[in-house]
Design a protein with these regions (language model features):
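Small-residue (G/S/T/A) turn/hinge positions that recur once per unit in extracellular repeat modules
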Residues: 120, 390, 498-504
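Surface-exposed interaction regions enriched in Ser/Thr/Asp/Glu
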Residues: 189, 445, 521-529
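Surface-exposed interfaces of beta-sheet-rich extracellular modules
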Residues: 492-498
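Alpha-helical structural elements
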Residues: 86, 504-507
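Non-catalytic, solvent-exposed segments at the cell envelope interface
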Residues: 1-481, 485-487, 491-492
Length: 529
C-alpha cells in the first residue's frame, strides 16, 4: 500500500507475497490430506469423526481446517489471476450515473479499458460512453422491445447496454458491443456508481484536478459532476476539444487524478477506511465485478460481487427503475409495501404496492419526454420481478403519458403494461411486471399488484412446522428504497421465530420496515396444529 496501488513497486511486492502464500497453502493442503488418510483410514470412520462427535459438531476439526485453507487458497488464486501474474488481463471499468438510474446502477457515463500485467496497469484508455460506437450503429445488436419503443432507439447502444438487472448478462452485453467497435475482447467488467467514486475522493481529501484550485472535497466534486459548477480542464488524451469544458470534462480529469493518487501510495489511516468503503459498496451492489474467466468466476459468484439475480425456490422480489435519458431519479423517491397472507396447502395471497413521490414544483404545462429538464417529470420504465411461483397476477393498466415520444409520433396503443415469464439471460423462471410510468412534478403515483403464490413457495419442515422465506434483491445505485414487508400467519398458527428481528409483531402479522441497503432475506418459522 505504501508503494501505491498497482505501481511497479506494489506489483513486485504483491507478486512475491502471493507466490509465497500460494506455495504455503498448497503445502498445508497436501499435509491435511495426508493427515486425513492417516486418521480416517480407508473405511471413512476413525479418529476425525470421533473428535467431531465428542465436540458436538457435524464437521471434524480436519474438515474445518481444510475448508478454511481451501477458501484462503481460492482467494489467493483469485488475486494472482486477476492481477495478471499468469498472463495479462484486460478489463473494462464502467462509471454509472445513479441519478439517471438503470438496472445495474445507472447510465454509463464513461468507460475505461485497462490491462493488468503482473500487477502493473498498462494500456489505460478512457472512453466517453457516447463515442464508443457511432451512427448508423450497424454493428450494434437489436434492442429489447421495450427499449425500442420507449428509448426510441433501433439499436442497443454501448451507453445503454446495461439494461439487464442480472449484471453478468449486462456485463456480457457491454463487452460484446465494445468488442464489435474496438476489436478488443475483455476478461471482465467492473462497474461503480459515481457516488462511490465521490466517496473515494472524500476519503482521500487531497485529490486535485487541473480545473480546480486546491484539493477537492466530496461536496465540491459532486457539484462539478452534477454540472452545478462551470469547469474547464484538460480531459482525456486524444480529445478534439482541448481545453475541454463541462461535467464530462471534469469526470475525465477526476478519473486520471484518482488513478495517479492511488499510484502515489495510500497512507496507513486511509487504508482501513478505503477497504471498508470498498466492502460496503460491494455489499450495497454499487460496486460490481463480473469476470469471464472460469478460474475467476466462482469467487465473484459466491460473494455476490457480480450483482447476479439469484434463483431461489421460495418467494422473491426485486423492483427496478429505468430512467430515460436526461431524466434524473433524484427528484423522485420510491417506496414499496409487500403483504403476504400465508396459508398451508393452498396458494398464498400476495399484495405489492409501489409508490413514487416527485418533489418538484407542480407544473403549469404538459411535460415532454424530449424535454430534459430534470425537475419536470420522472420518466421511468419500472420492472417488478416476481418468483416462478407467482400466478393469477392482477395489475392495472399503465397508460402512456401524453408527452411520450410514442404518442407524439402518432402511435395509438396507449397501455404500456408488460408481463413476461423469462426464459434466459439470467432471469429464467422470474415473472416480470413492468410499464412506462411517468411521475409528474408535485404528484404521487401508486402501482398496486396482486397475485398468488403456489403452495410450493412455503417449505414444510415436518411436525407441523413451516418456513416462509422471502429474498428481496436491491437495485444497484438505489440506496433509499423504503420498504414494508408484512407476513400474516395462518389462523391458529404459532410463531416460532422470525429473522431479521421484526419491527413489530401484532396478532398474526409479522412486520418489517426499513431502508433497503443490500439484498435481504426475511424468514418466518411457524407451527400449525
Amino acid at each position: 500500500w505504501e508503494h501505491g496501488v498497482l505501481s511497479p513497486a506494489f506489483a513486485q511486492q504483491a507478486g512475491e507475497r502471493l507466490g509465497a502464500t500460494r506455495g504455503v497453502l498448497d503445502t498445508a493442503l497436501r499435509e491435511v490430506g495426508a493427515l486425513r488418510l492417516l486418521l480416517e483410514g480407508a473405511g471413512g470412520g476413525g479418529m476425525g469423526r470421533l473428535l467431531a462427535r465428542a465436540l458436538g459438531g457435524g464437521l471434524s476439526p480436519l474438515d474445518r481446517l481444510e475448508a478454511a485453507l481451501t477458501s484462503a487458497r481460492l482467494g489467493v488464486e483469485f488475486l494472482w489471476v486477476f492481477l495478471g501474474y499468469d498472463r495479462p488481463r484486460t478489463y473494462l471499468f464502467l462509471a454509472q450515473n445513479q441519478n439517471e438510474i438503470r438496472p445495474t446502477g445507472g447510465f454509463i457515463g464513461y468507460a475505461a479499458r485497462f490491462t493488468l500485467d503482473r500487477g502493473v496497469v498498462t494500456d489505460l484508455v478512457l472512453h466517453d460512453s457516447t463515442e464508443v460506437d457511432a451512427p448508423p450503429y450497424e454493428r450494434n445488436p437489436q434492442p429489447p422491445d421495450f427499449i425500442y419503443w420507449y428509448l426510441w432507439m433501433e439499436r442497443l447502444l454501448f451507453r445503454d447496454a446495461n439494461w439487464n438487472p442480472h449484471f453478468p448478462s449486462s456485463a456480457a452485453a457491454v463487452a460484446e458491443v465494445y468488442a464489435r467497435w474496438t476489436g478488443v475482447s475483455v476478461d471482465g467488467v467492473l462497474a461503480a456508481t459515481k457516488a462511490t467514486i465521490l466517496d473515494v475522493v472524500g476519503l482521500f481529501g487531497d485529490v486535485s484536478v487541473p480545473g480546480h484550485p486546491g484539493p477537492l472535497t466530496r461536496a465540491v466534486a459532486e457539484e462539478y459532476v452534477e454540472g452545478q459548477r462551470p469547469y474547464t480542464g484538460r480531459g482525456r488524451p486524444g480529445r478534439s476539444d482541448t481545453p475541454c469544458t463541462g461535467k464530462r470534462c471534469f469526470d475525465e480529469d477526476l478519473f486520471f487524478s484518482l488513478v495517479e493518487r492511488l499510484r502515489q501510495g495510500v497512507p496507513l489511516p486511509v487504508r482501513g477506511a478505503l477497504a471498508a468503503l470498498v466492502g460496503e459498496q460491494a455489499r450495497r451492489k454499487n460496486l460490481l465485478v463480473h469476470l469471464f474467466d472460469p478460474a475467476l468466476a466462482p469467487l465473484v459468484w459466491e460473494t455476490g460481487w457480480n450483482g447476479a439475480v439469484r434463483p431461489v425456490d421460495h418467494d422473491y422480489l426485486m423492483v427496478v427503475d429505468n430512467a430515460l435519458p436526461g431524466h434524473e431519479r433524484k427528484w423522485a423517491s420510491r417506496s414499496w409495501e409487500y403483504r403476504v397472507h400465508v396459508a398451508v396447502d393452498r396458494p398464498l395471497e400476495a399484495d405489492l404496492r409501489l409508490r413514487y413521490i416527485h418533489r418538484g414544483a407542480p407544473l403549469q404545462e404538459v411535460c415532454r419526454q424530449a424535454d430534459w429538464r430534470a425537475s419536470t417529470c420522472y420518466w421511468n420504465f419500472f420492472q417488478v420481478f416476481l418468483p416462478r411461483w407467482a400466478t393469477e397476477i392482477e395489475a392495472p393498466p399503465v397508460p402512456l403519458h401524453e408527452g411520450t415520444e410514442r404518442l407524439a409520433w402518432g402511435y395509438t396503443e396507449g397501455d404500456s403494461l408488460r408481463m413476461v415469464r423469462h426464459r434466459g439471460e439470467g432471469l429464467t423462471g422470474l415473472v416480470e411486471v413492468g410499464g412506462y410510468l411517468t411521475v409528474e412534478a408535485g404528484t404521487v403515483v401508486t402501482v398496486p399488484l396482486r397475485y398468488r403464490l403456489a403452495p410450493e413457495a412455503l417449505r414444510p419442515l415436518g411436525e407441523g412446522r413451516y418456513l416462509y422465506r422471502l429474498l428481496v434483491q436491491k437495485q444497484p445505485g438505489v440506496d433509499d428504497d423504503h420498504y414494508t414487508v408484512a407476513v400474516r400467519l395462518p389462523e391458529d398458527a404459532t410463531l416460532l421465530g422470525a429473522t431479521p428481528s421484526p419491527t413489530r409483531v401484532a396478532g398474526r402479522w409479522v412486520v418489517w420496515r426499513g431502508t433497503l441497503t443490500a439484498d435481504a432475506t426475511f424468514e418466518v418459522l411457524f407451527r400449525t396444529p
